[in-house]
């Protein structure tokens, strides 16, 4: 009997050890996930300026070359034209090619004077064909076109619906283009109330706004045509509005295109080059401010 005791003791110890080994081990909780800081949303704002709008294409080309791609685009008038084509998925080089191939007659449908000498349907159709008939909300990037409500005088930011019609409304210079009726309201050029629509971009969620200002300064000299008179009036009216709007932009790009008339489609290549040069000069500022914003988030 005594000889069994050591054996029983050994067996008990073995069972105890086995039980201890079989006991579940409480897992160590994983470390809390690291909260990733959201990247700042970049808004590209393209101002109005008729034929000077070709400079926007150069600006886009240089930004793309540096990997600076906007999350949203907002445009007025000529800026709405370029912005819609860009938001549809065309890159800077595609836009440049399209600009060089475009004929003025493709976007101008002259008519007998009836609240405007250009109907605007040609521009509307040109845009819709170029973007595959997609509505605003179906474009590749978030986009808005800014127009002026002719009855209330307030800015209207189009973010859904017929893209070509919204661009046409945004570009309808009073006295040149006929007003555009959308949902029972009439709209004219957005440059009357928002030539460089920075506020619209902020309202859409932009954390960092790059604004391209192609507005013209009033010209000293003869205004040779009715259109020249109207555009001179726009330039005079828009100066104070532009200064006010640009205060809320992070970076302002001003291509040196003062020698290019708003009605001159012949110097489009020069306008593109000046847009490229203006952004290239502003790149250190853009990169420094973006880096600072990212560090602080």
Task: Describe the function of each predicted region.
Residues 75, 79:
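Gly/Ala-rich beta-loop-alpha elbow adjacent to hydrolase catalytic centers
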Residues 2-4, 8-11, 21-73, 85-297:
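Patatin-like phospholipase
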């Amino acid at each position: 009997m005594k000889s069994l005791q050591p054996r029983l003791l050994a067996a008990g110890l073995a069972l105890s050890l086995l039980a201890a080994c079989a006991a579940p081990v409480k897992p160590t909780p994983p470390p809390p996930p690291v909260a990733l800081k959201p990247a700042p949303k970049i808004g590209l704002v393209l101002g109005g300026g008729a034929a000077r709008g070709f400079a926007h294409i150069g600006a886009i080309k240089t930004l793309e070359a540096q990997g600076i791609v906007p999350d949203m685009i907002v445009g007025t008038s000529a800026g709405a034209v370029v912005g819609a084509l860009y938001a549809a998925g065309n890159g800077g080089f595609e836009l440049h090619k399209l600009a060089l191939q475009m004929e003025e007659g493709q976007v101008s449908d002259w008519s007998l004077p009836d609240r405007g000498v250009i109907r605007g349907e040609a521009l509307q159709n040109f845009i819709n064909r170029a973007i595959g008939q997609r509505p605003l909300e179906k474009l590749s990037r978030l986009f808005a076109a800014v127009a002026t409500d002719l009855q209330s005088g307030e800015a209207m930011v189009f973010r859904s619906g017929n893209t070509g019609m919204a661009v046409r409304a945004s570009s309808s210079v009073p006295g040149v283009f006929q007003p555009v009726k959308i949902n029972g309201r009439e709209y004219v050029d957005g440059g009357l109330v928002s030539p460089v629509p920075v506020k619209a971009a902020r309202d859409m969620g932009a954390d960092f706004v790059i604004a391209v200002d192609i507005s013209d300064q009033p010209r000293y000299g003869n205004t040779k045509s009715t259109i020249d008179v109207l555009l001179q009036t726009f330039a005079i009216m828009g100066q104070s509005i532009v200064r006010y709007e640009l205060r809320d932009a992070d970076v302002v790009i001003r291509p040196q295109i003062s020698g290019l008339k708003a009605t001159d489609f012949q110097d489009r290549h020069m306008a593109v080059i000046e847009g490229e040069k203006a952004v290239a000069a502003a790149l250190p500022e853009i990169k420094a401010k973006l880096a600072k914003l990212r560090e602080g988030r």
